[in-house]
Curated annotation (Swiss-Prot):
Reactions that this protein is recorded to catalyse: Release of an N-terminal amino acid, Xaa-|-Yaa-, in which Xaa is preferably Leu, but may be other amino acids including Pro although not Arg or Lys, and Yaa may be Pro. Amino acid amides and methyl esters are also readily hydrolyzed, but rates on arylamides are exceedingly low; Release of an N-terminal amino acid, preferentially leucine, but not glutamic or aspartic acids
Function text: Presumably involved in the processing and regular turnover of intracellular proteins. Catalyzes the removal of unsubstituted N-terminal amino acids from various peptides.
Protein known as: Probable cytosol aminopeptidase
Principal localisation: cytoplasm
Cofactor note: Binds 2 manganese ions per subunit.
Entry GO CC: cytoplasm
Phylogenetic lineage: Bacteria, Bacillati, Bacillota, Bacilli, Bacillales
Disulfide bonds: none
Gene that encodes it: pepA
Sites where the protein binds Mn(2+) 1: 270, 347, 349
Amino acid sequence: MFTVKPWSSAEVVHEALAIGLFEGKDSWSGLAGEYDSRLGGQLSNLRKEGDISAKRGRIATIHTMLPTGVKRLYFVGLGKKEELTFERLREVFGKLFRTWKQAKRTEAAIALDTFTTETVDSNEAAHALAEAYYLATYEFPGYKQKKSEPDYALESLTVYTAADAAEIEASLFVGSVYGKATNSARTLVNTPGNLLTASDLADYAVELAKRYDFDYEILEKEEMERLGMGALLAVNQGSKQPPKLIVLKYQGKEQWENVIGLVGKGVTFDTGGYCLKPRDSMIDMKTDMGGAAAVLGAMEAIGELRPEQNVLAVIPATDNMISAEAFKPDDVITSLSGKTIEVRNTDAEGRLILADAITYAKQHGARYLIDVATLTGGVIVALGTDKTGAMTNNEALFEQLLEASMETGEFIWRLPITEKDRERVRSSKIADLNNSPGREGHAIMGGAFIGEFAEDTPWVHLDIAGTATTKKDGDLGPAGATGVMVRTLTAFVERFE
């Protein structure tokens, strides 16, 4: 879809051309000024009247009425040059693509160098451009018998730049991979629970593994029973759908060492079990496998980019249902690690299945662990819906993950786990651990519980309950699943040291 070319005004013939504008006179002396001269100063008049603005996020569409060349100019406001960041540029590009989508543009061009600064170079701008295209134009296909509109696609986008074409093409490829992988995760999270069971999720993972030549294994219920995965099996007791433990292995080094373990919560629908959720809280619980989707999305990107790392992805998959066989409050279960757990809340099931998955990942070579889960409503109370909560037992690992999150624009905020928090999850009088010792510090209790299974292995817990979905349309996509943490995990794996 992307074509990279050097600028030559004599050859520029397009339905639409986007030009970036920074506040100040400098940007008007470049390409914008060139078109202003060709149009007899009319653009300057429109700028004076406020119809063309350099304020960040403002987009002005100008019909040139020229007999040849560019039919429409899109002036894209970028704000102050010194304030432009990768994330802000990505959002602006997203707004531009949503504008083109609404106008049904299928062919366009961008003067890339008008969107760059000393801190955001052409390669970064190209990455932001490609990523923003896929994120901003995403739509969940849905299940309506008749679609109101055909699927949109920008068939051709010419990127004009003076930078090295091969480098720009490489950046466009990486940005496309990030965007497409995020959209894959979005689609998984948006899929209804009756159409995405644990078996369906396992089938998806197998197809992914075959596509990218990963080693894989799907552990069935019988194997879990043999191994002693009592925590995952307990959560699955009330379901007619069999549980699955999905294991994907990407080996980017000669030796299977320094393995990064990515563990994603895969609860395909959560009723809360016998600690039943109220109706309003149960709506959208199809999204409770957002952690699994993030890990699978990251594995898709890793399969495309082939970094020199070793990655083990482990996804415990089940739903949490009610039946005569379902697990109950006051049950005591034995996890794969051998630690016993007193169940005080059947709606605190995510940490149970993650316990067995983390133990399994450690047993199969993971030396670093990152788990991703829509774990607690408490993290939303604490941090809102734009920040992912993080907990860790290792400063160095967390700092690398934090750097990746800042690079990709997926904001994370660290919450503490103290010795008193650990004492609370160890507070059961009849078992090693209590899965829900109270509402106070609820998000931290979830992380502290999972940390009991990470033990001394460097580990970061990411609670995406607030960030996995959004209720409103934005510059980078529609309401629904966000695919959060796909990009952060991918960037982390690529740059891990």
